[in-house]
Amino acid sequence: MLLSLKSRFVGNVYVIECVGRIVLGDEVKALEAELQVAEREFSRIVLNLSEVSRLDSIAMGLLVRYAERLGKRGGGLRLAGPPPFVTTLLNMTKLSTMLPGYPTEEDAILSFLKQDSGGEAKERSGPRVLVFDESADLCVFVRTVLTGRGYDVRSTCSFRDAKILLGVDGTDYILVGPSTPRLSAETVVQSLTALSPKANVLQMAPDFKIRDAREATDALLQMFGSGQDSQA
């Protein structure tokens, strides 16, 4: 297959990085499968096309179809770093409004996050929490537990993305998981706290991710009930 895909989430934005060709066959099928996974939980998707060398009419039709579906849910599909040939195609077909392009991935992500920060801030139902850990599954688990208790949770597996989230909107809690790639937990805490100095800082214990789900849930809830600078 001539296409490789890499995905992650930044808060409530799902990011798909594409490298290669998006054309009829296995490539389009692979991208559609990734979009199907994304839309199960996310309505806002960023597609990074900066390293895409070809995109045929079938692929464009796929993007339009998902842009329409996501738009009906209040979200959308936005393109990051589209090559000149894609930009030209969007302008020729008058699709640039439905599939807006941004110079960089960060710009596309921020376009969604700033939209949240402005128009939807009044809809928050509880304290804000930023969760950072390299495990997407752990982030989903923590987000599910805390959201069910009334917290407004954003999570990410990327340190860079965590800083983007804090740069757009502050938080009441910073929750750092046991797995922080390339950086020590202490460095992560110091860097993120500098961006949101009033936030309560919480750290999961090193064995948190291997605990029984019930035990982990109890520890998580106890940690949030015990105040600042706690560890579960």
Task: Locate each region found by the language model.
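Conserved Asp/Asn-Gly motif in the active-site loop of CheY-like receiver
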Residues: 105, 156-160
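Active-site beta3 strand of CheY-like receiver
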Residues: 54, 170-180
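Acidic catalytic/metal-coordinating carboxylates
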Residues: 158, 184-187
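Conserved acidic segment of CheY-like receiver
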Residues: 126-136, 142-146, 174
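STAS-typified acidic loop motif
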Residues: 2-36
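Non-catalytic signal-transmission and effector/linker regions of two-component phosphorelay proteins
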Residues: 1-10, 106-128, 208-232
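Short hydrophobic/Thr-rich beta-strand motif most characteristic of the beta2 strand and flanking loop
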Residues: 150-157, 165
